[in-house]
Amino acid sequence: MTTKRKAYVRPMPSTWWKKLPFYRFYMLREGTAVPAVWFSLELMYGVFALKHGPETWADFVGFLQNPVVLILNLIVLAAALLHTKTWFELAPKAANIIVKGEKMGPEPVIKGLWAVTAVVTAVVLFVALFW
């Protein structure tokens, strides 16, 4: 049986996400995908510049030294750190770790993830700068 009645659809303003801080932060976190796209394009440009020889690589390095690009890269870094922070805070909620019959709190897991991140970053920087 079909009906000709129109279903009620509650009006939803386009600014619905601005009402609660939780939704604003959610939109900010999801917005970190946009700077990730910029970084991906920049990385691909660098790979192709590396492939095409020293002159193209020098052009790429000059591009990276542009003040606008430096500011964009700082924004990308901030977005990546925010995204990392939210994922590290989510990780303990996804795994129940039981030590000596008691559930472990989220702090050791989060601190461990940050420690691993710091160690890997230090190793990569050491290899890149001094190897």
From Swiss-Prot:
* Keyword field contains Membrane: yes
Sorted UniProt keywords: Cell inner membrane, Cell membrane, Membrane, Transmembrane, Transmembrane helix
Q: Name one Pfam family in it.
A: Fumarate_red_C
Q: How does it assemble?
A: Part of an enzyme complex containing four subunits: a flavoprotein (FrdA), an iron-sulfur protein (FrdB), and two hydrophobic anchor proteins (FrdC and FrdD).
What is the first-listed, main subcellular location in coarse terms? membrane
What Gene Ontology cellular-component terms does the record carry? fumarate reductase complex; plasma membrane
**Protein's membrane topology:** Multi-pass membrane protein
> Has the keyword Ribosomal protein been applied to this entry?
no
Name the protein family. Answer: Belongs to the FrdC family.
Q: Which gene encodes it?
A: frdC
Highest taxon of the source? Answer: Bacteria
**By what name is this protein known?**
Fumarate reductase subunit C
Supply the SUPFAM superfamilies for this chain.
Answer: Fumarate reductase respiratory complex transmembrane subunits
Organism annotation: Enterobacter sp. (strain 638)
What is a single molecular function from GO for this protein? succinate dehydrogenase activity
- According to the record, the segments passing through the membrane are 60-80, 110-130
According to its UniProt entry, the function of this protein is described as: Two distinct, membrane-bound, FAD-containing enzymes are responsible for the catalysis of fumarate and succinate interconversion; fumarate reductase is used in anaerobic growth, and succinate dehydrogenase is used in aerobic growth. Anchors the catalytic components of the fumarate reductase complex to the cell inner membrane, binds quinones.
Checking Gene3D superfamilies in the record gives: Fumarate reductase/succinate dehydrogenase, transmembrane subunit
Which CDD domains does its entry note? QFR_TypeD_subunitC
Localisation per UniProt entry: Cell inner membrane
**Which residues are in coiled coils?**
none
